[in-house]
Amino acid sequence: MNIRPLHDRIVVRRIEEETKTAGGILLPGSAQEKPSQGEVLATGNGQIRDNGETRALDVKTGDKVLFGQYAGQTVKVDGEELLIMKESDVLGVLEG
């Protein structure tokens, strides 16, 4: 099943982060924070402005993005946990 987000929303798959500290200590599941970066799987058509025009989104499918720990709404699609969030929830795009 595919999701087509509406307007200025994007679908993101979380990218799992390291479960080990820099000193080599393994963190238990209860001490780990939710990953705050992910890959954009789909984007909406853009933000609808007050004058009715649509502004294209800055993020594109395939971008690796950073977002706040509590950003977006979690949904399950075909057994996979995804996030749907507004583009404004994205803090930045990882490049390189």
From Swiss-Prot:
PROSITE patterns reported for this sequence: CHAPERONINS_CPN10
Pfam families documented for this protein: Cpn10
High-level lineage: Bacteria, Pseudomonadati, Pseudomonadota, Gammaproteobacteria, Moraxellales
GO terms of molecular function: ATP binding; metal ion binding; protein folding chaperone; protein-folding chaperone binding; unfolded protein binding
SMART domains the UniProt entry points to: Cpn10
Gene Ontology biological process terms in this record: chaperone cofactor-dependent protein refolding
Function of the protein: Together with the chaperonin GroEL, plays an essential role in assisting protein folding. The GroEL-GroES system forms a nano-cage that allows encapsulation of the non-native substrate proteins and provides a physical environment optimized to promote and accelerate protein folding. GroES binds to the apical surface of the GroEL ring, thereby capping the opening of the GroEL channel.
Cellular compartment(s): Cytoplasm
Main location: cytoplasm
Native source organism of the sequence: Psychrobacter arcticus (strain DSM 17307 / VKM B-2377 / 273-4)
Cellular component aspect of the GO annotation: cytoplasm
Keywords: Chaperone, Cytoplasm
Family statement: Belongs to the GroES chaperonin family.
Claim: tRNA processing is one of the keywords in the record: no
Name this polypeptide is given: Co-chaperonin GroES
Region (Disordered): 26-48
PANTHER family xref list: 10 KDA HEAT SHOCK PROTEIN, CO-CHAPERONIN GROES
Complexes and interactors: Heptamer of 7 subunits arranged in a ring. Interacts with the chaperonin GroEL.
